[in-house]
Amino acid sequence: MKKNIGVVGCGIVGLLVSYKFSQLGHKVTIFEKDNGLNFSNCSATAAGMISPYCELIHSDKKIFELGETSLLKWKKIIKELNSRIFFKSKGSLVVTQIAEKSDLELICERVNSHTKSKLKILTNKQIQKLEPDIDSINLAGLFFKDEGQVDCLEIMNALIKFLKLNGSIIKFESHVEGIKKNTVSLKGGERINFDHVIECAGLDS
């Protein structure tokens, strides 16, 4: 059954949630406090790194698994959007001074014990081969070959374009003051009812 869905927040999370509901055939309305030309949310400034192995250095295996899955999902989403979006999965290079090589050894041990990786510390010559512009004389490093990055602004613009073309409504400069029982209350007193409301606004929104 087709549902009427309200989404609060037009950052990367709000757009992806809206994209999924739109694909399933539901009616989607997004509320965003910014004007659409000058996003101030963190999605617009994020580096777009998809780095499950690097995350594993300080996080648990569940975060790693989510990151690994996201690499596959991004490829699928970008293919579906059929837009020019910067996306690469050519790996991440982590370097440190030779004197701090022991830190890399600990990282190697942790990553290898949680994954099927067989990471080894790179020599300065191996680093130079990967990144010729780095002065690698006193460096050691690790290369996570499966990591990647996506341009957040390009993916957001592509998602907005898709949603508009497929009948979704995006209400920019809409200040949501409250959500109660699937009703969105806007500044000025307007109240809009939905079957479901998903709050995707960021911190301090």
Model-predicted regions and their roles:
Residues 9, 32, 96:
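Short beta-strand/turn micro-motifs composed of small residues
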Residues 13, 36, 204:
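Conserved Rossmann-like nucleotide-cofactor binding loop
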Residues 23-44:
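Glycine-rich FAD pyrophosphate-binding loop
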Residues 47-130:
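Dinucleotide-binding Rossmann-like beta1-alpha1 core, especially the glycine-rich loop
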Residues 142-182, 186, 191-196, 200, ...:
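Helical element adjacent to the flavin cofactor pocket in flavoenzyme catalytic cores
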